[in-house]
Amino acid sequence: QPPHFRPHGISLYIDTNGKRHLGIINHPKNRELEPENVELFSEDENGLFMHQQTITDPLFKSPNALVLMAQNKFYLGNDKGAETAFGKIQEQLGRPMSKIIYFNGDSASVAAENLSQISGINTSKNNKYLFASETAAKRIAIFSINENNGVLKKLETIKINGSPDNINVSSNDDLIVAAIPKVMALIQHFISFQKEEIMPAPSQVFQIKWDFNSEATIEELFLSNGEDISTTSVGAIFDSKLFMGSITDKKLLICDL
């Protein structure tokens, strides 16, 4: 196992033999001073995931999300991209500077850039399209994937009424997107932890039906003030139920659809 493990983004890949593999972002103790890593695990005969490889690259600046394309190939989304003090100010003011990185099994390269705070990425079931949450711009970016070199070509963006986080893709390629309805409420929620007077923050989940040949349809599946679950960061549909996870709450909320 890695000597230090501070996991963030996680992705599951199932190969043609049915064997499962995990890719997990592993933040260092001192972010911006030490390298960011991606840890690769594979399932053994007992169903346990054993560590296989640690991958690091200077392009892994501020990784937030990743999606495995094969056992050791993946896309990684940096939620920040600025490298200078002035650049960080520009980014805070809204300049899109995030990048999506492609690791081809040997080396990393920039697959897409000039994006607004990537917080979630996923692919269509046929691996021809990649979806990315541009949190600061309140939109989902849709890319076609070049199978030869991993480069992403932006096809369109879908605006939503919230700041998107992680994206799950259903069996019929619908996007299940967790979102932050009010960013200021999220900030107040984080501050309340320091004061030990927990203030709930609203939660939101969208279902987006997207087809290359038609306009996307957006349905709000869930919206609450945060009393039941605060700051939803992920949503998934299984067996006609919506499962939701949170940035801060140590629980899942399950709702009938």
Predicted feature descriptions by range:
Residues 1, 44-58, 99-120, 141-160, ...:
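Blade-edge beta-strand/turn elements of extracellular beta-propeller
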Residues 1-14, 57-74, 80-82, 95-100, ...:
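Beta-rich, blade/repeat-based domains predominating
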Residues 21-23, 73-75, 129-132, 174-177, ...:
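Conserved beta-propeller blade signature
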Residues 24-32, 76-95, 178-200:
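Short, conserved, GDST-rich strand-edge loop motifs in beta-rich repeat architectures
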Residues 31-39, 86, 97, 139-142, ...:
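Structural motif
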Residues 35-45, 92-105, 197-211:
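Beta-propeller blade signature
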Residues 161-222:
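Loop/turn-rich, solvent-exposed surfaces of beta-rich toroidal or solenoidal domains
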Residues 231-257:
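Blade-level signature of beta-propeller repeat domains, shared across WD40, Kelch, NHL, RCC1
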